[in-house]
Amino acid sequence: MISRHVARLLTLLCLLLATPSLSMAAESITDSPRRPIRSTDRRLRALLEEGLRISPTLRALVARLHASDVVVYLQCDGPGGPDGRLTFVSSVAGFRYVVVRMGRFARMQQIAMMAHELQHAVEIADTPAIVDGPSLVREYQRIGYVNQRSSLPGVAFDTQAAVRTGEQVLKELMLENASY
């Protein structure tokens, strides 16, 4: 009888140790070892965390990137920088690396711009043929349009999906803000 009780207790203990705790399960995807989104900018990391708490759309984008081979580096430029721009960096060891550079905006607009650019990263994740800058341009000529309003040098592309995503995340943030 005692040995059966001890065996059950040991089994329960093993299950508890082998199963991630609720706090670990709730751990932010941006803190996971295979972080799909990285930044050295504390403000951008904090805004991403805030956006993930509030926006189901942003959470879906990050989850999709987490399941992909795309790694995104976020950077914030000073005044006069681009509103937002994704640049293909490299394909190495089974991963595709992109950099998103954004201007500095107010909190909600910054999160919405981040979502807009992360939608572009998802578009790359959904297209395995994008492996370098030229293949990125070819794909965006197919799925997007030239952004005539861009003040950046060179050709800047955009997609309706990215525009809609940024708008949707901004709506979600404004609804949450209005509930306070």
Each predicted region: which residue ranges?
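Bacterial N-terminal signal peptides that target proteins for export
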Residues: M1-L10
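A metal-dependent hydrolase signature that marks the N-terminal structural subdomain at the beginning
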Residues: I2, S21-V92
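Bacterial N-terminal signal peptides
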Residues: L10-S21
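Acidic/histidine-rich, surface-exposed loop or edge segments in extracytoplasmic proteins
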Residues: D31, R35-R43, G94-R101, Q141-S150
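Metalloprotease/metallohydrolase-associated module, dominated by Zn2+-dependent proteases
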Residues: R53-V62, A67-F88, M108, S135-Y180
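Active-site scaffold of zinc-dependent metalloenzymes
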Residues: D77-Q109, A121-I124
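A conserved beta-strand element that flanks and buttresses the S-adenosyl-L-methionine
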Residues: M114
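Catalytic Zn2+-binding segment of zinc metalloproteases
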Residues: L118-P134
